[in-house]
């Protein structure tokens, strides 16, 4: 019996939201000889389909011996789409068939399009594909034919492996199941995502996709997302969701040339009405540094009632709606997001390292093995991009849209198909540096067993020495920092070992843009070193206020510009380097704030009417938290209040009010 054959055939998937990168990679199974006849020779499997009548009667002259007759049928998974209105609820579409995807589109989107005159479709532009949450599938109408086309051998003799039987030997059976999983991943990518994109384009629409899945995602996250027009990650205000999804999206966007990397942002469950911009910001900034540059706030629920507060809500999502008590001031928050999104969409992302995710499927994240030292950035990359988009220029793995990587890290595994390994070998020969170990065999049954000799030959040749053609070869086991040093790749950003500061870097022909984020609640002061040439000079672009100012205190040395940086708790800033800076110079990078006046006069507070607060203004001698009030109408008040007081002060160019 094949170990864990339900998982290997995708008849059962890990029911967890974040399967590890190696969840569908299995160690070689301990095996026994065939003395008891448990292994089925592939030439003993007979196809009886032609002997089956339309009424289900099997007519067959059975040869001598003991035979097992198996009947394999295709049926729906039984999964229905959700959430959906009753009228729009039905079985999930076959995601490995463009024909069925087109039919699904016509029955749903087509009906909407037919009801809206073309002249009135000004706001209907995008078809959204949310995260994959519908379970797997492992078959489609023409599965046998497409299998033969993809791999060059007939899969029918190996079908008993779908219910755990060993055909040929354990290795051959496992390889067949590997081919099956890979074919499913390809089908879901090209027929579902690509098919929906194609039919949308025919109707003047584009697609927007979250390229990861929970509860049965059968695809490969990079290839899957690469077929969509636009790509998105996701993060919640708390918990682990977002820790892999946003890197999934940004890597996909970078290697497939998508300018905008969206994120379903600030989704949440749990305690109601506890989210507000200040406690969302650090998490937003964190995922900005992972490549997100287009924020889609989750969510705004339509509010049909004027007299009901806090209005209609749901168990999921932050309440970005007009019934929220801070909605009237939300422009401060959205302006910060808009400014950040704009700058993070400029130029090209800077990354030194590309981690190859391997070819095994299903897969919705890659492996960062070994860990990348602090101060460097990376992307995940897949086989499709090697085969169709990648070339080497000046020692960099270069993609058509401008992305460049100096070092390719191979996954810690022994298998790779010869066409992929051969392409990597060509790239290294042309000047790329690679880190890893020589693959020894193919994971596929296609071309078996001769294909293993080809993989071993290419791998041995590539990893025989520390140079291959124009490229460099580094064996797994060498400390990665030593590899980067040998290639003269210095950290892109340095700020001290223990600083809680994250960064991302984007480059333009005439500017370098760094986004830096303090992830702690306390103020930090550090000397930032940026890998920027000396013809540039630094500016601070404040995404909260829109202020742009020159930073006069900096030094240029050995490929870096260093300058003192100060960030308040959870503050973020853009450090932009430009040539020929013409901004007005200031004396200090971060002028110190000086207390010029203390307000000791009483405060008159008027609470918003209709929110169950005090009906008349109250007077406090000093400011305090409403939650500490003994007056319940203040303690539990949810709304806005106007504070008024009088005080004397001298005239200054700029004053800040600190009410903490």
Walk through the language-model features, giving the residues of each.
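Mature N-terminal, pre-catalytic/accessory segment of carbohydrate-active enzymes
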Residues: 1-124
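Carbohydrate-binding surfaces of carbohydrate-active enzymes
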Residues: 1, 12, 18, 112-126, ...
């Amino acid at each position: 019996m094949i170990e864990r054959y339900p998982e290997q055939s995708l008849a059962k998937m890990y029911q967890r939201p974040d399967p590890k990168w190696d969840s569908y990679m299995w160690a070689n199974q301990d095996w026994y000889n065939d003395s008891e006849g448990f292994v089925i020779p592939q030439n003993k499997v007979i196809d009886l389909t032609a002997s089956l009548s339309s009424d289900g009667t099997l007519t067959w002259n059975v040869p001598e011996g003991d035979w097992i007759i198996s009947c394999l049928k295709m049926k729906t998974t039984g999964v229905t789409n959700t959430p959906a209105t009753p009228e729009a609820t039905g079985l999930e579409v076959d995601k490995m068939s463009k024909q069925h995807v087109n039919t699904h589109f016509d029955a749903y989107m087509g009906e909407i399009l037919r009801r809206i005159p073309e002249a009135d479709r000004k706001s209907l532009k995008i078809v959204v594909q949310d995260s994959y949450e519908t379970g797997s599938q492992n078959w489609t109408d023409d599965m046998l034919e497409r299998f033969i086309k993809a791999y060059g051998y007939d899969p029918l003799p190996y079908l008993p492996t779908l219910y755990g039987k060993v055909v040929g030997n354990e290795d051959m059976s496992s390889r067949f199941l590997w081919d099956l999983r890979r074919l499913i991943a390809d089908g879901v990518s090209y027929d579902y995502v690509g098919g929906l994109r194609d039919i949308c384009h025919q109707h003047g629409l584009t697609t927007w996709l979250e390229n990861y899945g929970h509860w049965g995602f059968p695809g490969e996250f990079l290839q899957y997302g690469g077929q969509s027009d636009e790509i998105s990650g996701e993060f919640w205000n708390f918990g682990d969701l977002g820790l892999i999804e946003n890197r999934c999206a940004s890597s996909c966007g970078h290697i497939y040339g998508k300018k905008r990397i969206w994120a379903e942002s600030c989704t949440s469950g749990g305690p109601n009405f506890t989210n507000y911009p200040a406690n969302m910001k650090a998490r937003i900034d964190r995922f900005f540094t992972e490549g997100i540059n287009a924020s889609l706030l989750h969510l705004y629920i339509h509010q049909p009632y004027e007299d009901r507060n806090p209005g209609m809500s749901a168990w999921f999502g932050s309440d970005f709606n007009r019934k929220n008590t801070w909605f009237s001031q939300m422009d401060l928050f959205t302006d910060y997001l808009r400014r950040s999104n704009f700058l993070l969409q400029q130029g090209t992302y800077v990354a030194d390292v590309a981690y190859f995710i391997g070819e095994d499927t299903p897969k919705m994240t890659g492996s960062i093995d070994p860990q990348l030292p602090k101060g460097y950035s990376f992307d995940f990359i897949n086989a499709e991009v090697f085969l169709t988009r990648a070339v080497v220029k000046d020692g960099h793995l270069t993609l058509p849209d401008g992305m460049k990587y100096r070092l390719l890290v191979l996954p810690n595994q022994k298998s790779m198909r010869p066409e992929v390994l051969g392409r990597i070998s060509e790239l290294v020969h042309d000047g790329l540096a690679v880190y890893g170990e020589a693959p020894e065999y193919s994971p596929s049954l296609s071309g078996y067993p001769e294909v293993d000799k080809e993989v071993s030959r290419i791998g041995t040749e590539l990893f025989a020495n520390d140079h291959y053609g124009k490229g460099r070869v580094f064996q797994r086991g060498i400390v990665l920092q030593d590899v980067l040093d040998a290639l003269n790749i210095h950290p892109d950003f340095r700020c001290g070992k223990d600083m809680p500061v994250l960064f991302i870097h984007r480059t333009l022909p005439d500017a370098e843009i760094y986004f830096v984020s303090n992830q702690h609640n306390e103020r930090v002061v550090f000397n930032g070193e940026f890998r920027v040439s000396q013809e540039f000079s630094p500016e601070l672009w404040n995404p909260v206020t829109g202020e742009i100012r020159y930073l006069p205190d900096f030094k240029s040395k050995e490929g870096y510009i260093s300058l003192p940086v100060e960030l308040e708790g959870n503050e973020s800033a853009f450090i932009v380097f430009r040539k020929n800076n013409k901004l007005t110079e200031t004396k200090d990078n971060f002028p110190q704030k000086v207390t010029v006046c203390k307000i000791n006069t009483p405060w008159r507070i008027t609470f918003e009417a209709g929110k169950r607060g005090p009906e008349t203004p109250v007077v406090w001698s000093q400011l305090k938290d409403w939650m500490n009030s003994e007056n319940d109408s203040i303690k539990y008040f949810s709304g806005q209040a106007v504070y008024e007081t009088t005080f004397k002060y001298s005239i200054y160019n700029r004053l800040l009010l600190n009410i903490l």
